Amino acid sequence: MFARSFSNASRTIARRSLSTRSGPAPSSLWSSRNAVIAGTTLAITALAVTSERRKVFNESAQKATSPRDSIIAQDSLKENVHKKSVRQDEFSGESTKPEASTSSDSVEKAADDAAQILEEKEAEASEPSQGAYNPETGEINWDCPCLGGMATGPCGEQFKAAFSCFVYSEAEPKGVDCVELFKVMQDCFREHPEIYGEEIDDDEAPAQEGTMEEKVEAAKEETAAPAAAP
């Protein structure tokens, strides 16, 4: 822009200088030519400088990023990072869901099993005793057929003492504190072999099934008849 104005002005001045002089001298003509050449040279130089400046400015403008473009780029970067984070969170949540579900199922199953066991034990405890001993009343039904009439024979008292000791025993193993009473009962059995011969044989042959202690335990657990009336 500046170069064009300067060039036009130079040409106008040169023309006016030539037109105002009729019949110019050779020296004047030479001076006018020099002025035109100088003006043209200056105009070309100014144009070249201006073009170079524009080129540099355009390149700088292309390389430089506007604030708006920078903000858009930052927003895009943030959006990508946010999406990636959300995807990772979703993946982590999906991977933990099966584990949480499995753990919850195991806990519920264990709770159901424990409740069922407690109900069964409670039902068993609430039922009347099925053996010679009734834990609800703490009494022993000596007339129970499961005792085989041993409570009424010649060694009935010895049997009752041994059996009662065994039933109420809290020692471990159960009945270990009733050994002496069992010996007394067995001695009584030996005095009456005609009645307690089978029990004596069992006592003298431990390899055979049915020791006295086992029979007492079996009698306690066998099905009992209704309790005798007082």
Swiss-Prot record:
Alphabetical GO biological process terms: protein import into mitochondrial intermembrane space
Sections of the chain in a coiled coil: none
One Pfam family hit: CHCH
Record-annotated CHCH domain positions: 152-196
PROSITE patterns, per database record: CHCH
Disulfide topology: 144-146, 155-188, 165-178
Motif extent (Cx9C motif 1): 155-165
Keyword Transmembrane: yes
Residue ranges, Mitochondrial matrix side: 19-34
Domain of life: Eukaryota
Primary localisation category: mitochondrion
Functional note: Required for the import and folding of small cysteine-containing proteins (small Tim) in the mitochondrial intermembrane space (IMS). Forms a redox cycle with ERV1 that involves a disulfide relay system. Precursor proteins to be imported into the IMS are translocated in their reduced form into the mitochondria. The oxidized form of MIA40 forms a transient intermolecular disulfide bridge with the reduced precursor protein, resulting in oxidation of the precursor protein that now contains an intramolecular disulfide bond and is able to undergo folding in the IMS.
Subunit structure, as described in the record: Monomer.
Domain remark text: The CHCH domain contains a conserved twin Cys-X(9)-Cys motif which is required for import and stability of MIA40 in mitochondria.
Protein's name according to its UniProt entry: Mitochondrial intermembrane space import and assembly protein 40
Organism this protein belongs to: Cryptococcus neoformans var. neoformans serotype D (strain JEC21 / ATCC MYA-565) (Filobasidiella neoformans)
Gene expressing this chain: MIA40
